[in-house]
Amino acid sequence: MAPNIYLVRQRISRLGQRMSGFQINLNPLKEPLGFIKVLEWIASIFAFATCGGFKGQTEIQVNCPPAVTENKTVTATFGYPFRLNEASFQPPPGVNICDVNWKDYVLIGDYSSSAQFYVTFAVFVFLYCIAALLLYVGYTSLYLDSRKLPMIDFVVTLVATFLWLVSTSAWAKALTDIKIATGHNIIDELPPCKKKAVLCYFGSVTSMGSLNVSVIFGFLNMILWGGNAWFVYKETSLHSPSNTSAPHSQGGIPPPTGI
């Protein structure tokens, strides 16, 4: 038992010595591994910002002749996390339009699961990129001398690539459904608009260009992480032995790694 405690203390002591040796080295940022990580960090910001910060509204024009001959605007406001079934229609303040309580009617659909999965994952990626860059730049020797850290980085990179594909695909499908649910189909779904005495016309809906951009950045992130997997793999023990065994046996100097 005592030898085991001694070994644990010794490992903790070595780790503490390495962690205390923080020294900024910007050279890793000039290599593909570090440079692509910076691009991943920036792309993740655009991914969650363009989706999570969206606010929009859809409008319909209503009249019911002969009581109301002038079109009145009824508006439903929606945004992230896109629980459309909680977005009720609102008439102008103090205006009774066709004796209908428009607040009782809402948009159709709940797309919060896809939207929140996408944004939450993008935020986690953002935080991981910060931690990875801190390790690359501040603890370069610790990363290069360790067998576990590059392997963990490699596994995380593969998982992140897959999750970018899954989350972006799910969000792209949800976005398509959101466009349908807030578009011209509103007229066909609203019960008051099915009455003969009430005439409804689709007005407008907020442009969803930023949401389209979020999907683009999602797939861009997937490409960046997938491409960076090779450079992370080169730092692992899975790749290094084949490159370092020959030079060592000949008494030469092993080739430099990606960092």
Curated annotation (Swiss-Prot):
Membrane disposition: Multi-pass membrane protein
Q: Which of the residues are on side Vesicular?
A: 55-116, 172-212
Entry GO terms, CC: extracellular exosome; melanosome; membrane; plasma membrane; secretory granule; synaptic vesicle membrane
Q: Where is the MARVEL domain?
A: 28-237
List the subcellular locations.
Cytoplasmic vesicle membrane; Melanosome
Which residues are reported to be glycosylated?
71, 212
Report any one BP term from Gene Ontology: chemical synaptic transmission
* Record topological domains on the Cytoplasmic side: 1-33, 138-150, 234-259
**What gene is behind this protein?**
SYPL1
Q: Where are the transmembrane segments?
A: 34-54, 117-137, 151-171, 213-233
InterPro entries in the cross-refs: Marvel (IPR008253), Synaptophysin/porin (IPR001285)
Protein name (Swiss-Prot/TrEMBL): Synaptophysin-like protein 1
Return the similarity comment. Answer: Belongs to the synaptophysin/synaptobrevin family.
Its keywords, alphabetically, are: Cytoplasmic vesicle, Glycoprotein, Membrane, Transmembrane, Transmembrane helix
